[in-house]
């Protein structure tokens, strides 16, 4: 099962840097970053409720996560998404992420696609 594989790497107890977007008291989008290695943050748990997609909310969440990473002294963000997640792939490419070889636990996962972005001050 795809979910059980990913769930082991997405425990919320390891996510201390989280961005939440509220509309009328409801969380409509989220994202997080956690240290992957010195100087490198990994973007995790990007999600926008379906009825709020297409409003550039995810782009704003990603911008905040990148800004936060820079403020914390990191120079690069990496992330993984599913190859079939066309909206996510488009978001990451549109916001300056480039495809990289699958890293870490995703190295041999055919349905994973990994990205990287060098952050600019």
Which residues fall in each region the model found?
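Acetyl-CoA-dependent GNAT
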Residues: 1-44, 49-50, 62-64, 102-105, ...
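Conserved acetyl-CoA-binding loop-helix of GNAT-fold acetyltransferases
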Residues: 48, 54-67, 94
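Conserved short alpha-helix immediately C-terminal to the canonical SAM/SAH-binding motif I
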Residues: 61, 85-88
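Conserved GNAT acetyl-CoA-binding A-motif
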Residues: 62, 69-81
